Amino acid sequence: MSASWADVADSEKAVSQSKPPYVPPHLRNRPSEPVAAPLPQNDHAGYGGQPAGSRWAPPSSGGGGASGGGYRNDGGRTGYGYGAGGGGGGGGGWNNRSGGWDRREREVNPFGDDAELEPVFTEQENTGINFDAYEDIPVETSGGDVPPPVNTFADIDLGDALNLNIRRCKYVRPTPVQRHAIPILLAERDLMACAQTGSGKTAAFCFPIISGIMKDQHVERPRGSRAVYPFAVILSPTRELACQIHDEAKKFSYQTGVKVVVAYGGTPIHQQLRELERGCDILVATPGRLNDLLERARVSMQMIRFLALDEADRMLDMGFEPQIRKIVEQMDMPPRGVRQTMLFSATFPSQIQRLAADFMSNYIFLAVGRVGSSTDLITQRVEFVQESDKRSHLMDLLHAQRETQDKQSLTLVFVETKRGADTLENWLCMNEFPATSIHGDRTQQEREVALRSFKTGRTPILVATDVAARGLDIPHVAHVVNFDLPNDIDDYVHRIGRTGRAGKSGIATAFFNENNAQLARSLAELMQEANQEVPEWLTRYASRASFGGGKKRSGGRFGGRDFRREGSYSRGGGGGGGGGGSDYYGGGGYGGGGYGGAPSGGYGAGVTSAWD
């Protein structure tokens, strides 16, 4: 009699119950592990999350969150997550002030692990000035109720986390610009600061900004918008300087809960948008890219409390005035007097001060003498070289430098044109001098590769246009060569400021010929002021320039003086209607509606405002 299908099924079930479960070969002979209890589930939390209403999930549960959460919820929108809620807890998500993950726990350490933290922080110790030799560096301040300077960082209430980072940086004491600028900014005053290159200007404005944001981190941002709402924006004229400020600000803000993001042109915008979506308290940007983000409605200026312009005179002088004015006055940025504005640069000519004053309210002008950048630290040489002899003269300098300086020493060569930079780079490489170049026509990736190659010493000669002259902190630059002198003495000051940094000595060599005659007077004055030896032939050129109306350098030992203290700036009403007194341009004193009585605040008869 044949067995039924039910009997066959029962017999197979009995056999299967008598067989041990199959174990793969690589797992055999191992002790069995206890089975983990199932994770709690509920209708309101994500996978493994806490019940709704709890702000934090325990570390062992793997996160999750209640409804309203998400990967990031700056504006109340739902992001990524499992279950009915999302990635964040409570009403939050990543970077939400009222809930979600603590960004400090998830922050990537920019310095590696703790063992590597200390050496990285000690790379730059009080860059720019030999403090023991320059205790008497001249400082001028003007404006009402100027806060007194401080002598140590311990005298300043910046917050525990920021003070810890300052100690990690081995910043023993504030630089002259920091001693005066930080108390002014902590007092919530607007500031226009003029200080030498390499004097610590970046830290001077970053410390108060980070400290101010740390103290008010409970402030809620608007909800229901795709835009991010930073509390501070720092504008820079070049991509390289923006990246440098970003790196420094990230170091200062480490473990403070303050998120710093950089945005600049020349690269695809998508990666920068992703960084912004992860949260942004401080936005470092170039004017063009920031305008792009504002027009896309991906960034809002509505919550801005701090506006900083680094190398402000360069931005205004390079033609960024319309873009900056649009950002500051035509978007939703709070007006001056509500936000705090700070402008920093190594030079502030009076014309630029007049423009910058439109952004500020009852500001303090701070001028720190540039003694440390031009006396003992930098030896300035001016050599008469005809155009046709410049290459051979440069080769002689480089050969002599090879014999006298160590392998770490770098040489920065400035030229006037982009084509000249490429041509000189190729010529140096053909003559067995490893060189690279940066200028405005190179892509951002090419510029970053060139700078990295130069900083590491793989190509110890960098040929550059003025794009590299402003603000960049490149260590070990022993020699700056002005292959082509600039047309303006302020650009010369910025160029030679690339050497003599971090308390190290440097050499600045300039090739001068008849084409540079208009610079002779100001160049001779600068060298005399710095106790440098002025060649007799340069003195003769300078005297000719004096008779011919050559340009006189303003500001003396400083990069500029407060134009409000000049005789041309008088707040009387007698110049109204363009008829009173005589201003800087000879077009009428300041009275009535503006400079020279112009009803719209112009600069007097015959002078076109840069804002027009």
UniProtKB/Swiss-Prot annotation:
A motif (DEAD box) lies at residues 310-313. One of its GO terms (cellular component) is nucleolus. The modification N-acetylserine is found at residue 2. Keywords: Acetylation, ATP-binding, Helicase, Hydrolase, Nucleotide-binding, RNA-binding. CDD domains: DEADc_DDX3_DDX4, SF2_C_DEAD. A motif (Q motif) lies at residues 151-179. Residues 377-542 form the Helicase C-terminal domain. It is an enzyme of class 3 (hydrolase). One of its GO terms (molecular function) is ATP binding. Residues 182-366 form the Helicase ATP-binding domain. It catalyses: ATP + H2O = ADP + phosphate + H(+). The keyword GTP-binding does not apply. Residues 559-568 have a biased composition (Basic and acidic residues). The Q motif is unique to and characteristic of the DEAD box family of RNA helicases and controls ATP binding and hydrolysis. PANTHER family: ATP-DEPENDENT RNA HELICASE DBP3. This is DEAD-box ATP-dependent RNA helicase 11. It comes from Arabidopsis thaliana.
